[in-house]
Each structure stands twice: as C-alpha cells, then as structure tokens.
C-alpha cells in the first residue's frame, strides 16, 4: 500500500516536507512526490505495483479549463473497462496506471466517479482553479484515509465535500 497525506491552510517548508515523507516512506518505499500550491499540500509515497514508470504522484491533469491534482492509494479491479469508457469520451492516457484512470474519471464525472469504481481506494483530488478538495474512500473502508482538523478549521465542512464511496 502507498501512503497519502495532505494539508490545507499552511505552506510547509522543505525540512517539514522531508520529515513528513520520511514517516510515510515505510508504506511507499518506491518513490515519493509532493504538490504544493500556496496553502495546499498533497504528498504521496508509492509502493509501485502497476506501471512503475508511469504512476508517479501526485498526478496532475489539465482538463476542460480545470487543473486536477490527485494523490491516490488503492487498486481498481475495473481499470480497463473505465479506461475504455473514458477514451470513448475523448480522454487520452499517458500511463497504464489505475491512478490516471481515477484522475480522468474524476475530471469527467466529478464526485460521482466513485460509483463507477470497483476496488479498494482512498484518494484526494484538489481542483486548483475551483480551490476545492474532494476526499473519498471505498465503500467498505479498506483503504483508510485520515485528514487533520486543520482542514475543517480552514475550509469548513461545507467547503470540503467528503464522500464515502
């Protein structure tokens, strides 16, 4: 399993980012990534199983005037089916990872994308232009997600849609 984390409301210095990534590293020894934009930070450490070269995260997609940033942990069992469905709707893919399928599905279907997913997952998507964070996990909660009180303090529950798959 990978490790994902995020924060809204503070800009983390390089030293703090390194320290946080070190604590996440045992769950994701194959690579790490950080997205930081003003007061939003998304972090990811990766256990590479599918498409080791192409699934680096956080993953960014520019689609229909919005920039989406995804940090994801999980496994979709219907990746190929969803990929074909999204291709038929005009999406193109650079990787073979289920991460990219999750990102494109969110861009196409919004929060309803989780209804299409068959698998175990937890993820966060930051919509840069809309300044909106969406958090989701699978129906059973096998892939756990945690978020700090910092999120609610700075955004308020009405600003951060949270959905249990």
What do these predicted ranges mean?
Residues 1-165:
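N-terminus-centric sequence/structural signature that marks the extreme N-terminus
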């Amino acid at each position: 399993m990978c490790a994902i984390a995020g924060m809204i409301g503070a800009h983390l210095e390089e030293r703090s980012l390194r320290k946080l990534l070190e604590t996440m590293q045992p769950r994701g020894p194959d690579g790490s990534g950080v997205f930081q934009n003003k007061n939003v930070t998304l972090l990811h450490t990766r256990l590479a199983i599918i498409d080791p070269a192409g699934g680096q995260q956080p993953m960014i997609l520019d689609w229909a005037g919005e920039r989406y940033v995804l940090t994801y942990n999980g496994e979709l069992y219907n990746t190929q089916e969803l990929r074909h469905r999204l291709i038929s709707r005009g999406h193109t893919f650079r990787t073979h990872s289920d991460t990219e399928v999750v990102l494109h599905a969110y861009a196409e279907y919004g929060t309803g994308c989780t209804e299409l997913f068959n698998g175990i997952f937890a993820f966060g998507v930051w919509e840069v232009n809309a300044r909106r964070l969406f958090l989701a996990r699978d129906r059973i909660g096998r892939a756990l997600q945690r978020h700090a009180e910092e999120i609610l303090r700075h955004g308020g529950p009405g600003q951060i849609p949270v959905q249990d798959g």
